[in-house]
C-alpha cells in the first residue's frame, strides 16, 4: 500500500527531498498537474481599471508560472438598465445606459479562488457586476506527480542501486 499526500505533488515536497538526497540536477515535475490554474474575467469602467487590477494582483490574481501582474484587457460597450431596486453609480434606474467598459482577464492559482473573489466583491465599483471563473487546461510546472532529474555521471544499474543505498 502506498499512501499519497499533497506533499507528493509539490515541487518542494517529498520527491524534491529525495532528488536532493540523490544530488540530482535539472530536476522537474514528471507529470505536471492540470486544473490548478483558473481564469477570472470581469467588466469595469476604464477609470476604475487600474485600481481594480492592482487590488486583484495583491490577492493572487494575475500570476502564471514565473510571472505576476499579468492580465489581458479589451475595450467595449456595456449596456444595462437598472430596475427600481437597483443602485447604479452610472446612469439612472429604469433607463438603459451605455458605457465604455474594459473586459479584463486574469489567471490565478485555483487555491486562491475565494481570496480573489472576495477582493473582486469588495473592490468592484458596480453594485451588481458580471464575472466568470473557468478552469484552464494549462499545466502547472510546480505541481504534479513525481520528479525527475539527472545524475552528474552515468552509472550502471548496479552502481545506481549502490548509490541509492549510500545516499538514502
What kind of region is each of these model predictions?
Residues 1-168:
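Hydrophobic structural segments
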Amino acid at each position: 500500500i502506498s499512501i499519497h499526500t499533497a506533499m507528493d505533488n509539490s515541487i518542494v515536497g517529498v520527491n524534491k527531498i529525495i532528488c536532493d538526497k540523490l544530488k540530482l540536477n535539472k530536476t522537474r515535475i514528471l507529470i505536471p498537474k492540470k486544473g490548478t490554474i483558473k481564469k477570472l474575467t470581469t467588466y469595469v469602467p476604464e477609470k476604475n481599471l487600474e485600481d481594480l487590477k492592482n487590488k486583484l494582483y495583491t490577492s493572487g490574481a494575475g500570476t502564471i508560472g514565473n510571472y505576476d501582474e499579468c492580465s489581458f484587457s479589451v475595450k467595449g460597450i456595456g449596456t444595462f438598465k437598472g430596475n427600481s431596486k437597483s443602485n447604479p453609480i452610472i446612469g439612472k434606474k429604469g433607463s438603459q445606459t451605455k458605457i465604455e467598459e474594459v473586459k479584463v482577464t486574469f489567471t490565478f492559482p485555483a487555491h486562491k479562488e475565494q481570496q480573489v473573489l472576495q477582493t473582486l466583491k469588495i473592490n468592484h465599483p458596480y453594485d451588481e457586476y458580471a464575472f466568470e471563473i473557468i478552469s484552464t487546461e494549462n499545466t502547472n510546472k510546480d505541481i504534479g506527480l513525481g520528479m525527475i532529474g539527472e545524475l552528474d555521471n552515468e552509472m550502471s544499474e548496479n552502481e545506481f542501486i549502490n548509490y541509492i543505498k549510500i545516499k538514502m
